[in-house]
Curated annotation (Swiss-Prot):
Keywords: 4Fe-4S, Cytoplasm, Disulfide bond, DNA-binding, Iron, Iron-sulfur, Metal-binding, Sporulation, Transcription, Transcription regulation
Subunit structure: The 4Fe-4S form is a monomer; upon oxidation forms a disulfide-bonded homodimer.
Main location: cytoplasm
Effect annotated for changing residue 56 to A: Spores remain white
Upper classification of the organism: Bacteria, Bacillati, Actinomycetota, Actinomycetes, Kitasatosporales
InterPro entries in the cross-refs: 4FE4S_WBL (IPR034768), Whib (IPR003482)
Cellular localization per UniProt: Cytoplasm
Entries under PANTHER family matching the protein: TRANSCRIPTIONAL REGULATOR WHID, TRANSCRIPTIONAL REGULATOR WHID-RELATED
Entry protein name: Transcriptional regulator WhiD
Native organism: Streptomyces coelicolor (strain ATCC BAA-471 / A3(2) / M145)
Cellular component GO terms held in the UniProt record: cytoplasm
């Protein structure tokens, strides 16, 4: 289940991008997998959802939203849940590496 505490407050301006989404009016089952869907069926559905996303004028905003709130389900902005998790994992790894590098560099420089 999504953690709604991470969602932005009730500010309609933050959500206006959704009014321009190519998926408006499209059956949401295209973007969210049914329980137990696997393999070729899941891949085909996700590819169909991504086709809608590829022609969407607010694809970047949609993907950014899904990443920001850590949306655990569905295709958002052309990214599946697995793809979003992979992106977040890579970002975490880069942050950890940068933090470790900065710490090591700071220690090597000595006192200021």
């Amino acid at each position: 289940m999504a953690d709604f505490s991470r969602l932005p407050g009730p500010n309609a301006d933050l959500w206006d991008w959704q009014l321009l989404a190519a998926c408006r009016g499209v059956d949401s089952s295209l973007f969210f997998h049914p329980e137990g869907e696997r393999g070729a069926a899941r891949s085909a559905r996700e590819n169909s959802a991504k086709e809608v996303c590829m022609r969407c004028p607010v694809r970047a905003e949609c993907a950014a939203h899904a990443l920001a709130v850590r949306e655990p389900y569905g295709v958002w902005g052309g990214l599946t849940e697995d793809e979003r998790e992979e992106l977040m994992g890579r970002a975490r790894n880069r942050l950890v590496a940068a933090t470790a590098s900065a710490s090591a560099g700071g220690e090597a420089a000595g006192p200021h």
